[in-house]
Amino acid sequence: MMKKSLCCALLLTASFSTFAAAKTEQQIADIVNRTITPLMQEQAIPGMAVAVIYQGKPYYFTWGKADIANNHPVTQQTLFELGSVSKTFNGVLGGDAIARGEIKLSDPVTKYWPELTGKQWQGIRLLHLATYTAGGLPLQIPDDVRDKAALLHFYQNWQPQWTPGAKRLYANSSIGLFGALAVKPSGMSYEEAMTRRVLQPLKLAHTWITVPQNEQKDYAWGYREGKPVHVSPGQLDAEAYGVKSSVIDMARWVQANMDASHVQEKTLQQGIALAQSRYWRIGDMYQGLGWEMLNWPLKADSIINGSDSKVALAALPAVEVNPPAPAVKASWVHKTGSTGGFGSYVAFVPEKNLGIVMLANKSYPNPVRVEAAWRILEKLQ
């Protein structure tokens, strides 16, 4: 009996110590500062905003300048260019269109753009565009493609290197086209559909494709070789890399994607789940719609090395997950993003109710971002 009581007491002590070990706001701040302050110095980053979602609650931290010339500090309202983290918005909006019955990932691309008459487009589905597996679409749409006619000409003349689904080659020209075609049945522009179906329902009031005049004061300058820059307009930019947002809105975005049960709109809730479904396996990584996932727990090396451009931008064999596997809570879900003057990173583990947003007004190497995020979240889990 004594043995049993002692055992129970030990178990209770262990379980209570787990709760007692919950971090205070000051402890979270210390953990974040110890990683971010030296990172900013080493990478010469003018300004950063970070949100940590710990036990489901957001904590915000800001450093440095949003505008060096005018001495404007980074605040919780500062707008940063998200770069390719914009693709996660594209994936969720596409998932919402699927949930509404407007599109199917199995649909041929030509159903939504009949003018694509080239033979190479036969057999390419929306799924392939959304997951970079169409057969080798290029990373960027060429700069001289400036209107819809030139865009059609570009896609008509593109020739695949592989059969659809053979390899994954990360490409703005792939998921960008998916986003544009996914909203066609709605009759809305991409920006309008994103605003009505994703941003407004999630109350992301400071997330923009086109930053309005009254928000320009909060729009940070990015810095490239010390010079202030903003992203240049381009074809399918909104769909691939065109979103700007604040650290508060991005924390809300992570919370919604980490646990969509509080999202009122059923199609959006389903869209969030579809974006984290697993459509292809590429090594340790699973490709979703915009989001990329790895099984949790994992070793730091697998995400840090996987984020290096030599791996992330390489053509790698893709194994189809058929039928797609539904979202897995025990996952490291993440996305990097860059423009000429900005670098962002978002990661979360739904099972742990733990996530991070890192926004910087300078582009710096992806592995450095991922390692910093890992170090912070590892200390908080």
From Swiss-Prot:
PANTHER family in the cross-refs: BETA-LACTAMASE-RELATED, D-ALANYL-D-ALANINE-CARBOXYPEPTIDASE/ENDOPEPTIDASE AMPH
InterPro entries (UniProt xref): Bact_CellWall_Synth/Modif, Beta-lactam-related, Beta-lactam/transpept-like, Beta-lactam_class-C_AS
Catalytic activity entry: a beta-lactam + H2O = a substituted beta-amino acid
Annotated phenotype, changing residue 172 to G/S/T: Moderately increases catalytic activity against cefoxitin. No effect on resistance to penicillins and cephalosporins in DH5alpha strain E.coli. Increases susceptibility to inhibition by tazobactam
Secretion signal span: 1-20
One Gene Ontology term of the molecular function aspect: beta-lactamase activity
Result of altering residue 140 to K: Decreases catalytic efficiency about 5-fold, with respect to nitrocefin or cefalotin. Decreases catalytic efficiency about 20-fold, with respect to nitrocefin or cefalotin. Confers weak hydrolytic capacity, with respect to ceftazidime
Keywords: Antibiotic resistance, Hydrolase, Plasmid, Signal
Induction summary: May confer resistance to poorer substrates by high level expression.
Protein name: Beta-lactamase CMY-2
One GO BP: response to antibiotic
Activity regulation (UniProt): Inhibited by the beta-lactamase-blocking agents sulbactam, tazobactam, avibactam and 3-aminophenylboronic acid (APB).
Active site: 84 (acyl-ester intermediate)
GO cellular component entries: outer membrane-bounded periplasmic space
Other facts noted in the record for this chain: Described as a cephamycinase, but cephamycin substrates such as cefoxitin are chemically very similar to cephalosporins, and sometimes classified as a type of cephalosporin.
Superkingdom to which the source organism belongs: Bacteria
A Pfam family per the record: Beta-lactamase
Amino-acid positions noted as binding a beta-lactam in the UniProt annotation, renumbered to this chain: 84, 140, 170, 172
Membership in a protein family: Belongs to the class-C beta-lactamase family.
EC number of the protein: 3.5.2.6
Function: Class C beta-lactamase which confers resistance to penicillins and cephalosporins. Has nitrocefin-, cefoxitin- and cefoperazone-hydrolyzing activities.
Protein encoded by which gene: blaCMY-2
TM helices/strands, residue ranges: none
